[in-house]
Amino acid sequence: MKYKLLPCLLAILLTGCDRTEVTLSFTPEMASFSNEFDFDPLRGPVKDFTQTLMDEQGEVTKRVSGTLSEEGCFDSLELLDLENNTLVALVLDANYYRDAETLEKRVRLQGKCQLAELPSAGVSWETDDNGFVIKASSKQMQMEYRYDDQGYPLGKTTKSNDKTLSVSATPSTDPIKKLDYTAVTLLNNQRVGNVKQSCEYDNHANPVDCQLIIVDEGVKPAVERVYTIKNTIDYY
């Protein structure tokens, strides 16, 4: 992945030229993992992060925590979903991610530290020449992923039996505010939902506080839910 650095003139307006230059692109690992594990991708030399999703009552519904090496590999990843009462904790061990508690091999890796296979579910991933995951497949489904020139995930299409679910995201035209986006979900070409997110950003152009509005158009009348996302991020 080639990195595009923000010119100093623009950096002055954002953070001052005495600060670390802003990396505008996303690494293949960060972008691909965010697709698979459902969290907002981050940029720059991230050391560790926690991303917390809260509902309108301020109750935590989901939390994702990760630690990364200086090379951008995920050393550990924990996913807590309180709505579905699930917890997944993975730790890196050579070419696998193991369950942090049982040490069972859960995810096989390819290349430096990219997703390759989830043996228990029969899922395998394919990457493009730049190392981004662009396809996932199993006996039951096929998924295709899309990215922009900076590696930002633009959505995915999932085909399973006679159903096709497509999510298409449109990020802000401001490269600094990439996580300000809108998205539309189609089921068999029929619109069933939309999403809008707006954020405040830190000096690395990563979101710190976000408002996420999710509208379920598959029911009548449509149901709108408002969430808050808070990120705590440490850098190298």
Swiss-Prot record:
A lipid is attached at C17 (N-palmitoyl cysteine). InterPro entries: UPF0257. A lipid is attached at C17 (S-diacylglycerol cysteine). Pfam families: UPF0257 (PF06788). GO terms for cellular component: plasma membrane. The lineage of its organism: Bacteria, Pseudomonadati, Pseudomonadota, Gammaproteobacteria, Enterobacterales. Keywords: Cell membrane, Lipoprotein, Membrane, Palmitate, Signal. This is UPF0257 lipoprotein YnfC. It is a lipid-anchor. Belongs to the UPF0257 family. The keyword Zinc does not apply. Coiled coil: none annotated. Residues 1-16 form the signal peptide. The keyword DNA damage does not apply. It is found in: Cell membrane.
